Amino acid sequence: MSEPTTAFAHYRVREGHVDEFLALVGKHGPILRRLGLVTDEPTRVYVGEDKPSGPLVIEIFEWTDQDAVSRAHTHPEVSQVWEAMGPLCEERDGRPSMEFPHLSRVDVS
């Protein structure tokens, strides 16, 4: 089993749809956790402006391992939430509607 990896999900949410989108994000983490796809590390969600163009939501969570990402992509309950998120987001300023960089924490001390 590989090490956990942290996802920094960037969602460029359509104007006027932030509350609806956040309701889906509120379901997302608990589903992933119940399915054993993410660690017990709390999911963090941030909302701001993707200046100058519109709302940006960032969701940070920790996959249990790299394989969890693949398993999530084939699970119908996860797919249902992801499919509902898609229409609420938009490409903006030449950037995709959603981006999912995965990073590993390093100790620099």
Write out the residue ranges for each language-model feature.
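Short, charged, low-hydrophobicity "junction" segments
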Residues: 1, 13-14
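Histidine-centered active-site/metal-ligand motif
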Residues: 28, 72-75, 102
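Glycine-rich beta-strand-turn "strand-cap" elements at beta-sheet edges
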Residues: 1-3, 39-58, 81-109
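Short, well-ordered beta-strand segments in beta-rich or mixed alpha/beta enzyme
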Residues: 5-12, 42-76
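Short amphipathic alpha-helical segments
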Residues: 17-43, 77, 81, 85
